[in-house]
Amino acid sequence: NYCKKNKLILIFDEMITGLRFNCSSVQNQFNLKPSISTFGKWLGGGLPIGIIGIKKNIIKKLDKNKKKIFFGGTFSGNSINTFIANRLVRYVYKNKKNIFDNLDKKSEFIQKEINLFLKKNNIDANCVRFSSMIRLVFTKKNIINRSQRDFFENQKKKIISEFRKYLFENKIYYPSSGIIFIATSTSYKQINHFIKISKKAFKRIKNSR
Protein backbone atom coordinates (compact mmCIF):
# COMPACT_ATOMS: atom_id res chain seq x y z
CA ASN A 1 0.00 0.00 0.00
CA TYR A 2 2.86 2.38 0.83
CA CYS A 3 4.52 1.79 -2.55
CA LYS A 4 1.24 2.16 -4.40
CA LYS A 5 0.36 5.35 -2.55
CA ASN A 6 3.77 6.89 -3.25
CA LYS A 7 4.06 5.50 -6.79
CA LEU A 8 7.10 3.41 -5.96
CA ILE A 9 8.21 0.15 -7.57
CA LEU A 10 8.54 -2.69 -5.06
CA ILE A 11 11.35 -5.10 -5.99
CA PHE A 12 11.94 -8.43 -4.24
CA ASP A 13 15.26 -10.25 -4.44
CA GLU A 14 14.21 -13.89 -4.02
CA MET A 15 17.38 -15.47 -5.38
CA ILE A 16 17.76 -17.45 -2.15
CA THR A 17 14.14 -17.65 -0.98
CA GLY A 18 12.41 -18.27 -4.32
CA LEU A 19 10.09 -21.30 -4.24
CA ARG A 20 11.70 -22.66 -1.05
CA PHE A 21 8.51 -22.66 1.03
CA ASN A 22 6.11 -25.34 -0.14
CA CYS A 23 7.02 -24.34 -3.70
CA SER A 24 6.19 -20.71 -2.94
CA SER A 25 8.28 -17.66 -2.07
CA VAL A 26 8.45 -15.04 0.69
CA GLN A 27 6.04 -12.80 -1.21
CA ASN A 28 3.46 -15.61 -1.21
CA GLN A 29 4.02 -16.40 2.46
CA PHE A 30 3.25 -12.81 3.49
CA ASN A 31 0.76 -12.02 0.72
CA LEU A 32 2.91 -9.29 -0.82
CA LYS A 33 2.83 -8.33 -4.50
CA PRO A 34 6.10 -6.81 -5.74
CA SER A 35 6.28 -5.21 -9.17
CA ILE A 36 9.54 -6.97 -9.98
CA SER A 37 10.96 -10.23 -8.57
CA THR A 38 14.25 -12.01 -9.14
CA PHE A 39 14.79 -15.76 -8.82
CA GLY A 40 17.64 -18.20 -9.32
CA LYS A 41 19.80 -20.65 -7.32
CA TRP A 42 18.18 -24.11 -7.16
CA LEU A 43 15.86 -23.35 -10.07
CA GLY A 44 18.76 -24.13 -12.39
CA GLY A 45 19.10 -27.67 -11.06
CA GLY A 46 22.86 -27.22 -10.68
CA LEU A 47 23.25 -24.97 -13.71
CA PRO A 48 23.57 -21.17 -13.51
CA ILE A 49 20.28 -19.37 -14.04
CA GLY A 50 18.59 -16.08 -13.26
CA ILE A 51 14.90 -15.31 -13.68
CA ILE A 52 13.20 -11.92 -13.58
CA GLY A 53 9.45 -11.63 -13.08
CA ILE A 54 7.92 -8.27 -14.05
CA LYS A 55 4.28 -7.22 -13.71
CA LYS A 56 2.39 -6.50 -16.91
CA ASN A 57 1.80 -2.83 -16.05
CA ILE A 58 5.58 -2.30 -15.77
CA ILE A 59 6.25 -4.16 -19.03
CA LYS A 60 3.64 -2.06 -20.84
CA LYS A 61 5.37 1.14 -19.76
CA LEU A 62 8.68 -0.21 -20.98
CA ASP A 63 7.13 -1.20 -24.31
CA LYS A 64 5.87 2.36 -24.87
CA ASN A 65 9.45 3.51 -25.21
CA LYS A 66 10.39 3.95 -28.86
CA LYS A 67 13.88 2.69 -28.21
CA LYS A 68 14.22 -1.04 -27.69
CA ILE A 69 15.43 -2.15 -24.26
CA PHE A 70 18.14 -4.77 -24.46
CA PHE A 71 18.35 -7.55 -21.86
CA GLY A 72 21.48 -9.64 -22.09
CA GLY A 73 23.80 -11.93 -20.20
CA THR A 74 26.13 -14.88 -20.62
CA PHE A 75 23.37 -17.43 -20.03
CA SER A 76 20.38 -15.43 -21.29
CA GLY A 77 17.99 -17.62 -23.24
CA ASN A 78 20.15 -20.72 -22.76
CA SER A 79 17.89 -23.55 -23.95
CA ILE A 80 19.45 -26.25 -21.71
CA ASN A 81 19.20 -24.16 -18.52
CA THR A 82 15.65 -23.10 -19.36
CA PHE A 83 14.57 -26.68 -20.13
CA ILE A 84 16.00 -28.01 -16.85
CA ALA A 85 14.46 -25.17 -14.81
CA ASN A 86 11.07 -25.82 -16.40
CA ARG A 87 11.20 -29.57 -15.72
CA LEU A 88 12.53 -29.06 -12.19
CA VAL A 89 9.81 -26.62 -11.17
CA ARG A 90 7.13 -28.92 -12.61
CA TYR A 91 8.54 -31.90 -10.69
CA VAL A 92 8.88 -30.01 -7.40
CA TYR A 93 5.38 -28.55 -7.69
CA LYS A 94 3.90 -31.97 -8.42
CA ASN A 95 5.67 -33.54 -5.41
CA LYS A 96 5.78 -30.48 -3.15
CA LYS A 97 4.06 -32.05 -0.13
CA ASN A 98 6.53 -34.91 0.20
CA ILE A 99 9.53 -32.73 -0.67
CA PHE A 100 8.85 -29.83 1.67
CA ASP A 101 7.54 -31.98 4.53
CA ASN A 102 10.83 -33.88 4.30
CA LEU A 103 12.93 -30.69 4.28
CA ASP A 104 11.01 -29.00 7.10
CA LYS A 105 11.19 -32.08 9.31
CA LYS A 106 14.96 -32.41 8.91
CA SER A 107 15.56 -28.69 9.40
CA GLU A 108 13.39 -28.60 12.51
CA PHE A 109 15.35 -31.55 13.93
CA ILE A 110 18.66 -29.73 13.42
CA GLN A 111 17.36 -26.53 15.01
CA LYS A 112 15.93 -28.34 18.03
CA GLU A 113 19.05 -30.44 18.70
CA ILE A 114 21.50 -27.55 18.37
CA ASN A 115 19.44 -25.10 20.44
CA LEU A 116 19.03 -27.64 23.24
CA PHE A 117 22.80 -28.06 23.31
CA LEU A 118 23.48 -24.31 23.21
CA LYS A 119 21.06 -23.64 26.06
CA LYS A 120 22.37 -26.50 28.19
CA ASN A 121 25.98 -25.33 27.79
CA ASN A 122 25.19 -21.61 28.10
CA ILE A 123 26.76 -20.79 24.73
CA ASP A 124 26.09 -17.36 23.24
CA ALA A 125 24.59 -18.54 19.96
CA ASN A 126 21.27 -19.55 18.48
CA CYS A 127 19.98 -21.66 15.60
CA VAL A 128 17.21 -19.86 13.72
CA ARG A 129 15.03 -21.30 11.00
CA PHE A 130 12.46 -20.26 8.43
CA SER A 131 10.92 -23.37 6.92
CA SER A 132 13.89 -25.37 5.54
CA MET A 133 16.39 -22.48 5.70
CA ILE A 134 18.71 -22.59 8.73
CA ARG A 135 21.17 -20.04 10.08
CA LEU A 136 23.52 -20.32 13.06
CA VAL A 137 23.58 -16.89 14.72
CA PHE A 138 26.44 -16.19 17.09
CA THR A 139 24.40 -14.38 19.74
CA LYS A 140 21.58 -15.34 22.13
CA LYS A 141 19.83 -12.05 21.57
CA ASN A 142 16.55 -12.04 19.69
CA ILE A 143 17.61 -10.30 16.49
CA ILE A 144 14.98 -8.96 14.11
CA ASN A 145 17.03 -8.01 11.06
CA ARG A 146 20.32 -8.50 9.28
CA SER A 147 21.84 -5.25 10.60
CA GLN A 148 21.41 -6.41 14.18
CA ARG A 149 22.85 -9.82 13.37
CA ASP A 150 25.88 -8.30 11.66
CA PHE A 151 26.44 -5.92 14.59
CA PHE A 152 26.82 -8.80 17.03
CA GLU A 153 28.66 -11.16 14.68
CA ASN A 154 31.20 -8.54 13.62
CA GLN A 155 32.43 -8.62 17.21
CA LYS A 156 33.02 -12.37 16.93
CA LYS A 157 34.74 -12.74 13.57
CA LYS A 158 37.63 -14.72 15.04
CA ILE A 159 35.30 -17.13 16.85
CA ILE A 160 33.16 -17.67 13.74
CA SER A 161 36.31 -18.28 11.69
CA GLU A 162 37.46 -20.92 14.20
CA PHE A 163 34.03 -22.54 14.10
CA ARG A 164 34.05 -22.69 10.30
CA LYS A 165 37.62 -24.02 10.24
CA TYR A 166 36.79 -26.85 12.66
CA LEU A 167 33.82 -27.92 10.55
CA PHE A 168 35.94 -27.83 7.40
CA GLU A 169 38.58 -30.01 9.08
CA ASN A 170 35.81 -32.53 9.70
CA LYS A 171 34.66 -32.56 6.06
CA ILE A 172 31.76 -30.14 6.51
CA TYR A 173 31.62 -27.06 4.31
CA TYR A 174 30.10 -24.18 6.27
CA PRO A 175 29.26 -21.34 3.85
CA SER A 176 30.46 -17.80 4.46
CA SER A 177 26.83 -16.63 4.46
CA GLY A 178 26.10 -19.02 7.32
CA ILE A 179 22.89 -20.16 5.64
CA ILE A 180 22.38 -23.93 5.68
CA PHE A 181 20.18 -25.72 3.15
CA ILE A 182 19.08 -29.32 3.56
CA ALA A 183 18.45 -31.51 0.52
CA THR A 184 15.92 -34.32 0.27
CA SER A 185 18.89 -36.63 -0.31
CA THR A 186 20.52 -35.54 2.97
CA SER A 187 20.39 -38.55 5.30
CA TYR A 188 19.88 -38.47 9.07
CA LYS A 189 23.33 -40.02 9.35
CA GLN A 190 24.77 -36.93 7.66
CA ILE A 191 22.57 -34.64 9.74
CA ASN A 192 23.66 -36.26 13.00
CA HIS A 193 27.28 -35.96 11.90
CA PHE A 194 26.76 -32.23 11.28
CA ILE A 195 25.12 -31.80 14.69
CA LYS A 196 27.88 -33.78 16.43
CA ILE A 197 30.70 -31.78 14.82
CA SER A 198 28.86 -28.48 15.38
CA LYS A 199 28.56 -29.26 19.09
CA LYS A 200 32.28 -30.00 19.29
CA ALA A 201 33.04 -26.77 17.43
CA PHE A 202 30.87 -24.74 19.80
CA LYS A 203 32.56 -26.33 22.82
CA ARG A 204 35.95 -25.64 21.33
CA ILE A 205 35.34 -21.93 20.74
CA LYS A 206 33.75 -21.58 24.19
CA ASN A 207 36.78 -23.11 25.91
CA SER A 208 39.21 -21.03 23.84
CA ARG A 209 37.75 -17.72 25.02
State where each predicted segment sits.
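Conserved N-terminal phosphate-binding loop of PLP-dependent enzymes in the Aspartate aminotransferase
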Residues: 1-209
